Every structure is written in C-alpha cells, then in structure tokens.
Amino acid sequence: MQGSFTFGVWKTKLYYLFRPPSEWDSLLISVTNGCTHRCTFCSMYLTKKFSVRKDIEDIKSDIHKAGKMFGSRVEKIFLEDGNAFVVKSNILIELTKYCHQQHPNLRKVSSYAHAKDILKKSDDDLKRLVDAGFTMVYVGIESGDDQVLKDCNKGATQDDYALAAQKCHQAGIDWSGIFLLGLAGNDPEKSRRHAVESAKLINRMAPAKPRKWYISPLTLEMTPGSEILAQNLEKKFQPCTSTHILEELYALIGNTADDLTDCIFNTNHASNYLSLKGELGKDKKDFLCRVEAGIKDPKVRRPEYMRGL
C-alpha cells in the first residue's frame, strides 16, 4: 500500500490527522479524536476536542470498507488519534481482531499511547491485546526529568514511563519511545539534567529479556499556537541553539548504559540536526563521535531550511 489512507475522519468536518513517520504506508483508522492531554510544546490537536468514537460498528464499517477497497494490500494499520490506547481494553481487542479478519496480510496494528493509560490496563488485558494481534505503542516520553515533564503538562513521571515500558515488554508489545531535545530550554544546568535523566530513563526501560525496542529523539520546534511559543514571546522560555541541542544529544547518548541491547536508536526525523541510526549501546561510540563532529563543525548539521515537523 503506497502512502497512508484514512477512514473515519469524523464525517461532518475535515481534520488534520497525525501519525508517526514510520506509519507513512499504514491504513489510518479513527478510533478517537484529538488527544487526552494539552502539552505546552504541541499544537497538533488544538482544533479538536478530545472524544472517543462510541459506535464500534461504525468503526468496524470503516475497517470493512477499507478491506473491500484495498484487499490484501494492507499490511499495517495505525489507530488514530493522539491517544487511541485510552479506549477500553475489550473494545481495542475487538477492533484489533476485526482488523486482522478484514485484512488477511496484516502484520502490524499500532497506536499512540500515554503511560498512564498503559498502566491502567491489567497485565492480562495487555496480553489479550497482543494475542488479538496488536503489536506496538508509540509513546511521547519527551524527558526523564520530572520537573520538565511537569512544566510541559505531560501528566506522567519517569517512574510511570519506566513501569509502562516494562509492562509492554512483558506483554509482548513493541515499545517506541520519543524524546524531545531542547524541551528544558537554554539553561545549561536544566538542559544537562534533562539529558541525563532521559538517559537514566532509557536505562530503566530496557527489557529484562532480549527483544527489540525503539528510541527516537526529536528536536523542539515552537509551532504556532503552542503554549511554549507564547512563553517564548513573553521571555519565559528561551530555546536552545543548535550547538546546545547537539550537546544535549551527546549527554543523552553518553549517559546510556554500555550494555544496552536490541535498542534501535534513530534521529532521522526532519526536526533533528544530525541523522543517526543504529543500536544503543553497540553503536554508542560511533554515535558520540558523529555528534561531537556536529558540535565542532556547523557544516555537518542539517541546515535550518531543511528542518521541520
């Protein structure tokens, strides 16, 4: 299937839908509308009041219509919107099973998730969800620093993320954690604490048994409508320079454990100044060398005009 296609875009009004970059070729199925949280750095869901689609048969109809239209071409389905994992476990299980029934070559069903909603689900619920064919959650962690998390209205702590990751690992749900470089602002002490605590959290999230898991740092962009942009205009928040961002990335990587395994680390997102892809800690030394080169030589960095969300 070439490119994302969306079913169930809330019929009466056209909305922007957002999905992880790696879900570019997925079928997008609307299960919720908007996001359960209003983080200071995010402007993606400002036009949407959060709600859950109540009519399960209506969602199934979207899944069925997509099956008729695309046949066996659909291999990945992403459940929209900002936090589809908030939906009750039995409903998610029912929808996941139906996705597989209608799309015979389906190999991946995923969604965005908030740590608190993962923690609300029992271990048995998560295991039944995996048995139904649900495969991955994308979790916007942003930081391991509890103060930064509080300041940006994230609604979770480092402990929450560490426990949520372990619950997913144990259930067999793939974990993709997203961090946000620059979120602490340009204060050197706060920036370093943001990086070091984020590395500490990565170490705590490592699965007890071998399995692939994913970490993807992005770089803060102060987008129109976001609270953090308003804070910047009021001189309450000052963003990091590109050099500071790379120093933060260096500290984050440098403070991760050397013995991390199967952790796919990716900074290919267009917001970042450097593109790295490999494994922590197998490729840790190489990552540090490349980030150090970017710190020393601005020519190595992605130009500002090529960056974006």
Label every model-predicted segment:
Residues 15-61:
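Canonical Radical SAM [4Fe-4S] cluster-binding loop centered on the CxxxCxxC motif
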Residues 51-54, 88-90, 150-154, 187-191, ...:
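Short, solvent-exposed loop/turn segments at secondary-structure boundaries
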Residues 67-175:
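Conserved SAM/AdoMet-binding glycine-rich loop
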Residues 1-18, 23, 203-309:
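Auxiliary Fe-S-binding modules of radical SAM enzymes
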Residues 42, 116, 140, 144-148, ...:
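Conserved strand-turn element in the central/C-terminal portion of the radical SAM core barrel
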Residues 45-50, 151-156, 232-238:
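Short glycine-enriched, charge-decorated loop/helix-capping segments at active-site entrances
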Residues 27, 77, 109-111, 137-139, ...:
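Hydrophobic faces of well-ordered beta-strands that scaffold small-molecule active sites
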Residues 59, 92, 122, 161, ...:
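Aromatic/hydrophobic pocket-lining residues that form the small-molecule binding cavity
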